[in-house]
C-alpha cells in the first residue's frame, strides 16, 4: 500500500536520559593495526554468532525532527531480524520484521506495510534515513562494506567512515560491553552532516 507521511512521536520526556546516556567520546591516540591477527580473530568470533539480541536507548536528531525511543533488536538467523521502537510508556511506535525477500513494518496505529527493502521503507515511513543495511553490521562492531576504519587498543572498532548514496557516515564507538564474549558495542554515534543517530545498548544476549 502507499507509504503515508508517517512520523514517530517525539518522545521528549526521554530526551535528557538518552542524550546523556549516549554521549560518545571520540577515540584519542593511535589504535591497533587493521591487519593484526587479533582483529581478524575478533571479527571471526562476532561473525560466528548465530543469534543475538540487544536493547537500549535510541535517538535521532536532525534539523527537521528529534526522535527519542527505547529499542529492541533481535537477530534469529541469516538476514532474519526484528527491530522494535517503544515510547517511555512501553507502547510500540514501530515494529519491523525482516527475512530474505520480505520486510513487514507495523506503525503505532497498527497499520501494516510490506517491502523488500527495509532501509528504504523505514526511511520513507519515518523520515529518518537510517543506514539500516550497514547498521546491522556496525551495531555488532563490524565494519561491513566500510574500508576506512580505526581500531582501539583492544583490537575493536573505534571509528568508521563510510560513503554511500550521497551520505557520508561517521561512526564513533564509545565503549564495549566486556561481559559478553566476544565483547559487543555498548554505545555508538552515527553522524552525517546535520543528522545524528545515537544508540546506547543496555545489554547483549549472544549465542
From Swiss-Prot:
One cellular component (GO) term of this entry: cell outer membrane
Keywords for this protein: Cell outer membrane, Chaperone, Lipoprotein, Membrane, Palmitate, Protein transport, Signal, Transport
InterPro entries per record: LolA/LolB/LppX, OM_lipoprot_LolB
Lipidation, S-diacylglycerol cysteine type: 22
Keyword set includes Transport: yes
UniProt keyword Signal present: yes
Chief location category: membrane
Membrane-related topology note: Lipid-anchor
Location of the protein in the cell: Cell outer membrane
Gene3D superfamilies: Lipoprotein localisation LolA/LolB/LppX
Record-level GO BP terms: lipoprotein localization to outer membrane; protein transport
Signal peptide per UniProt: 1-21
Covalent lipidation (N-palmitoyl cysteine), chain numbering: 22
Coiled-coil regions, chain positions: none
Pfam families: LolB
Subunit organization: Monomer.
Family of the protein in this entry: Belongs to the LolB family.
Entry function: Plays a critical role in the incorporation of lipoproteins in the outer membrane after they are released by the LolA protein.
Protein name: Outer-membrane lipoprotein LolB
Organism this protein belongs to: Escherichia coli O127:H6 (strain E2348/69 / EPEC)
Gene: lolB
Amino acid at each position: 500500500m502507499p507509504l503515508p507521511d508517517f512520523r514517530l512521536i517525539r518522545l521528549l520526556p526521554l530526551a535528557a536520559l538518552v542524550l546523556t546516556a549516549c554521549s560518545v567520546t571520540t577515540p584519542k591516540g593511535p589504535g591497533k593495526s587493521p591487519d593484526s591477527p587479533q582483529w581478524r580473530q575478533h571479527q571471526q568470533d562476532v561473525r560466528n554468532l548465530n543469534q543475538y539480541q540487544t536493547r537500549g536507548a535510541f535517538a535521532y536528531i536532525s534539523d527537521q525532527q528529534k526522535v527519542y525511543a527505547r529499542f529492541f533488536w533481535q537477530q534469529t538467523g541469516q538476514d532474519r531480524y526484528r527491530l522494535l521502537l517503544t515510547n517511555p510508556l512501553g507502547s510500540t511506535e514501530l515494529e519491523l520484521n525482516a527475512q530474505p525477500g520480505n520486510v513487514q513494518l507495523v506503525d503505532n496505529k497498527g497499520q501494516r506495510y510490506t517491502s523488500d527493502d527495509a532501509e528504504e521503507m523505514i526511511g520513507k515511513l519515518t523520515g529518518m534515513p537510517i543506514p539500516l543495511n550497514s547498521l546491522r553490521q556496525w551495531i555488532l562492531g563490524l565494519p561491513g562494506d566500510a574500508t576506512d576504519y580505526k581500531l582501539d587498543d583492544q583490537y575493536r572498532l573505534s571509528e568508521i567512515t563510510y560513503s554511500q548514496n550521497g551520505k557520508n557516515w561517521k561512526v564513533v564507538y564509545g565503549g564495549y560491553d566486556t561481559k559478553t564474549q566476544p565483547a559487543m558495542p555498548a554505545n555508538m554515534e552515527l553522524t552525517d552532516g546535520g543528522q545524528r543517530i545515537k544508540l546506547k545498548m543496555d545489554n547483549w544476549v549472544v549465542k
